[in-house]
Amino acid sequence: MTVLIHVLGSDIPHHNHTVLRFFNDTLAATGEHAREFMVAGEDNGFTESCPALSLRFYGSKKALAQAVIAKAKANRRQRFFFHGQFNISLWLALLSGGIKPAQFYWHIWGADLYEVSNGLKFRLFYPLRRIAQGRVGGVFATRGDLSYFARQHPGVRGELLYFPTRMDPSLNAMAKERQRAGKLTILVGNSGDRSNQHIAALRAVYQQFGDTVNVVVPMGYPANNQAYIDEVRQAGLALFSAENLQILSEKMEFDAYLALLRQCDLGYFIFARQQGIGTLCLLIQADIPCVLNRDNPFWQDMAEQHLPVLFTTDDLNEQVVREAQRQLASVDKSGITFFSPNYLQPWHNALRIAAGEAE
């Protein structure tokens, strides 16, 4: 039997760390198909912190792709589970036959599915990638992303799977730490990545609420982002008074980030694709509603779980936000499919499918 190999095809430290720790702590003990990894980027202590995994690191996305292609050609029974991916060379290999469809199983993370960049290189590449994505052996994704993908590639198998957000189920029914009344605190974006469209989001919040709310913008990740942070701060201060705007430029530890989220009343996310599911989960767990773009298909996952969904096109005010909070508080969080530990069983199923051990 050939052991399934997992591929983290791009150097995205935060996401890669979450996946590796999840596999090390939760899945590795269940079988050999959850232990072999090829990772783009440096070790950064992963080998030491994930002793249950066999990890191989590659200095660039291209070097990793070349190694994957070589393995795929050497043994056509070798299967790969691509997590996220974001690696042009791998898509081209699937398109050219370097990697066969039966060898390629893909967990969609969002950005690699949608065509949102206006850069010329990306606009030229998107049609090729779209063709390649129709050749994968199978995909795993959120309900909304599965629906989006199926419209383009109805013949490709799709299975429900959620990113393994770090969550403490004991907090699902936690007592409220403060009375939700008075001035609203709104979280804008889930990181400092430009895909959050922070400036447009700040303008949208101002248009809805004016300078009457506290606005918190977490921008400590990714690193080396000071010029963009300054740009967002300048745009924010043109709209909001200094005491109402908090731009967080330092990376936060998980517990500090969790505490920050729980001080908010509303999350505001205008990106037109699925992303930031970890932050969304933590907000929902704390009975904090989220405002989504109607083009972000994750609203389908939320609606399926009977969670209130607010849209950027809605007329928003404090009364609407408080009612959404009340509705969230009445939901039994233990039954939400994309919460821990409910997302575990689909991961076991995904491993068996990708390894060729399940029909």
Curated annotation (Swiss-Prot):
Localization per Swiss-Prot or TrEMBL: Cell inner membrane
GO CC annotation, single: plasma membrane
UniProt keyword annotation of Coiled coil present: no
Topology in the lipid bilayer: Peripheral membrane protein
Enzyme class label: transferase
Catalysis performed (reactions): beta-D-ManNAcA-(1->4)-alpha-D-GlcNAc-di-trans,octa-cis-undecaprenyl diphosphate + dTDP-4-acetamido-4,6-dideoxy-alpha-D-galactose = alpha-D-FucNAc4-(1->4)-beta-D-ManNAcA-(1->4)-D-GlcNAc-undecaprenyl diphosphate + dTDP + H(+)
Gene Ontology MF, one: 4-acetamido-4,6-dideoxy-D-galactose transferase activity
The protein's Enzyme Commission number: 2.4.1.325
Keywords: Cell inner membrane, Cell membrane, Glycosyltransferase, Membrane, Transferase
Metabolic or biological pathway, per its Swiss-Prot or TrEMBL entry: Bacterial outer membrane biogenesis; enterobacterial common antigen biosynthesis
GO BP field: enterobacterial common antigen biosynthetic process; fucosylation
Keyword Cell inner membrane part of the UniProt annotation: yes
InterPro entries: WecF
Domain of life: Bacteria
Family to which the UniProt record says this protein belongs: Belongs to the glycosyltransferase 56 family.
NCBIfam families, A to Z: PRK02797.1-2, PRK02797.1-3
Function: Catalyzes the synthesis of Und-PP-GlcNAc-ManNAcA-Fuc4NAc (Lipid III), the third lipid-linked intermediate involved in ECA synthesis.
Protein's name according to its UniProt entry: TDP-N-acetylfucosamine:lipid II N-acetylfucosaminyltransferase
Organism: Salmonella typhi
